[in-house]
UniProtKB/Swiss-Prot annotation:
InterPro entries: Enolase (IPR000941), Enolase-like_C_sf (IPR036849), Enolase-like_N (IPR029017), Enolase_C (IPR020810), Enolase_CS (IPR020809), Enolase_N (IPR020811). The active site is at E206 (proton donor), K341 (proton acceptor). Its cofactor is Mg(2+). It comes from Desulfotalea psychrophila (strain LSv54 / DSM 12343). It catalyses: (2R)-2-phosphoglycerate = phosphoenolpyruvate + H2O. This is Enolase.
Length: 423
């Protein structure tokens, strides 16, 4: 099969929030075309790669991406046409050079990532391999344990809960398919419980419920009820993962906090660490993402020293999938796990580099979607390719989330007895 890029095109499509995003098409000289669509985040770290928006208030409230589309067509395409499709790193590095900025603000990370993902997909097609094996090699066979978002708060919902995501993690399941069943059943039983108490069963951006609860702890209490109502044991069969997205309630993004949604009041780093320790003792928490704000490096270091032997302390906004910040975290022991988001850094190659750095340090890593997703299932293959064993891609509702789960079910079926699954 031919492996030379003959055309690159792009268009504006909508993500799961109804906002524009970029879809890129890469065509090989035998006529094969592969496409990829770029996700978008709501709670974003200040050091993330920049998605380019038009700022034209007359279109999509200023959120159009025609500039990014134009950059794909008129700047990136001429540079990559004629390149060998399997030279992923070379193509990604070429786009980084074309952009010339640290945060990809010139061409836009949404333009660059769209091309990077489409190139990877076309490379897999050209190599006659599934995407997960093309990116991860023939040994890629570990299906990630899903962390299903079942209660939303913070920036992802309009309610009285500060913590952005309360996730159910099927740590005791024997396979991905069974694990997905465990947490889907828990999701549906949670809906029944909420309904029986007159609480809202509307969902947030990632498909989790967004009820008005009296406290953050009330959210975990009701999830435990749902786990038990499903016939499972909290901690043994299903554990918790949390994402505080603490920068969203930190006025200075460093050591001060205001639990404004729940009315929990003002806190400092020491208060937040004490709260985390209390919750870890009380609830079956195995992973906690961004428990502190993105510039509270000292707080992260203290928290990791206190609880890092019990749970994964996951840096998201802290590291933004960037090896520069991950290296600092490893040096300072500011966490023990990294959230990997393709659009935080802007290329497939740099995302793989971030994973490689985690592996070399003995750190865990968690592959993640964004709150503004599309029907593209690239993330599912990428998670298997990276062999990290952990994935967050939303709830058991909203088809842009379900698409990733269904792709993982397909991969598990393809691998058969060779598939691995463990926390």
């Amino acid at each position: 099969m031919s492996d030379i890029i003959s055309a690159v095109d792009a268009m504006e499509v909508l993500d799961s929030r109804g906002n524009p995003t970029v879809r890129v098409f890469v065509t090989l000289d035998n006529g094969t075309t592969c496409a990829a669509s770029v996700p978008s985040g709501a709670s974003t770290g200040e050091n993330e790669a920049i998605e380019l928006r038009d700022g034209d208030a007359s279109r999509y409230l200023g959120k159009g991406v025609l500039k990014a589309v134009d950059n794909v067509k008129n700047i990136i395409a001429p540079a990559v046409i004629g390149k060998k499709i399997t030279h992923q790193a070379a193509i990604d590095n070429l786009m980084i050079e074309l952009d010339g900025t640290e945060t990809k603000s010139s061409l836009g990370a949404n333009a660059i990532l769209g091309v990077s993902m489409a190139v990877a997909r076309a490379g897999a097609r050209s190599s006659r391999l599934p995407l997960y094996q093309y990116l991860g090699g023939p040994g890629a066979r570990r299906i990630p344990v899903p962390a299903m978002n079942i209660i939303n708060g913070g920036e992802h919902a309009d309610n009285s809960v500060d913590i952005q995501e309360f996730m159910a993690v099927p740590v005791g399941a024997p396979s991905f398919g069974e694990g997905l069943r465990y947490i889907a059943e828990t999701f549906h039983n949670l809906k029944k419980i909420l309904k029986s108490r007159g609480l809202a069963t509307s969902v947030g951006d990632e498909g989790g419920f967004a009820p008005n609860l009296e406290s953050n702890e009330a959210a975990m209490d009701i999830i435990i009820e749902a786990i038990e109502a499903s016939g499972y044991t909290p901690g043994k069969d299903i554990a918790f993962a949390l994402d505080s997205a603490a920068s969203s309630f930190s006025p200075d993004l460093c050591g001060s906090y205001d639990l404004k949604w729940s009315g929990g009041g003002k806190k400092d780093s020491a208060d937040m660490i004490a709260m985390a320790q209390k919750w870890i003792e009380k609830y079956p928490i195995v992973s906690w993402e961004d428990p502190l704000a993105e510039n509270d490096w000292a707080g992260f270091q203290k928290l990791t020293a206190a609880v890092g032997d019990k749970i994964d302390v996951v840096g998201d906004d802290l590291f933004v999938t960037n090896t520069k910040y991950i290296a600092r975290g490893i040096e300072e022991k500011s966490a023990n796990s990294v959230l990997i988001k393709l659009n935080q850094i802007g290329t497939v190659t740099e995302s793989i580099d971030a994973v490689r750095m985690c592996r070399e340090a003995g750190w865990r890593y968690f592959i993640s979607h964004r709150s503004g997703e599309t029907e593209d299932t690239f993330l599912a293959d990428f998670a298997v390719a990276m062999d990290g064993g952990q994935l967050k891609t939303g709830s058991a509702s909203r088809s842009e989330r379900i698409a990733k789960y269904n792709r993982l079910l397909e991969i598990e079926r393809e691998l058969g007895a060779n598939a691995l699954y463990y926390w």
